[in-house]
């Protein structure tokens, strides 16, 4: 699978070779995660964190990994203060957030929400929800 520019919405997208490829890349990146090596490969890139339900470890781990590779993180985990509260649709939110991000990680409790968001997004979306898309 060519992951470049692709949404990752479900484990069902992956076959065995895709999983092997992901583990290989993770192995290559390990020295950066334990700070034995430094890279700025993601310098200038922006990760949009979009969490519609509580998260500590997942939200922080994605942000930390992106930072360790030189990228910046835009937190949007305070959904209660977003325009969604005023009635903005998840589609409009996707269009706006994706214009300010290079990739978006998202957790949403409602089935179908991440898929709808990804369809409106201009950038890849990674589903971090515990439910199926």
Where are these regions (language model features)?
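A short helix->loop->beta-strand "cap" motif at the edges of active sites that frequently abuts
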Residues: 123
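Positively charged, low-complexity intrinsically disordered leader regions
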Residues: 1-60
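Conserved small/polar residues in nucleotide/adenosyl-binding loops
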Residues: 131-133
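Glycine/small-residue-rich loop that forms an oxyanion/phosphate-binding "nest" at active or ligand-binding sites
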Residues: 126-127
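Active-site cofactor/substrate anionic-group-binding motifs, chiefly glycine-
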Residues: 46, 51-92, 96-99
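A glycine-rich helix N-cap at a beta->alpha junction
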Residues: 100-110
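Active-site-adjacent beta->alpha loops and helix N-cap segments on the catalytic face
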Residues: 111-119
């Amino acid at each position: 699978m060519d992951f470049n520019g692709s949404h990752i919405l479900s484990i069902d997208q992956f076959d065995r070779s895709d999983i092997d490829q992901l583990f290989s890349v993770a192995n290559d990146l390990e020295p950066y995660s334990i700070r034995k090596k430094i890279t700025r490969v993601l310098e200038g890139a922006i990760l949009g964190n979009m969490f519609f339900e509580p998260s500590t470890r997942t939200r922080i781990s994605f942000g930390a990994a992106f930072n360790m590779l030189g990228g910046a993180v835009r937190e949007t985990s305070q959904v209660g203060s977003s325009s969604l509260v005023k009635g903005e649709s998840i589609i409009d939110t996707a269009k706006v957030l994706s214009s300010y991000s290079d990739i978006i990680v998202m957790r949403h409790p409602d089935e179908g929400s991440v898929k709808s968001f990804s369809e409106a997004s201009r950038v890849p979306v990674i589903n971090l929800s515990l439910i199926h898309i």
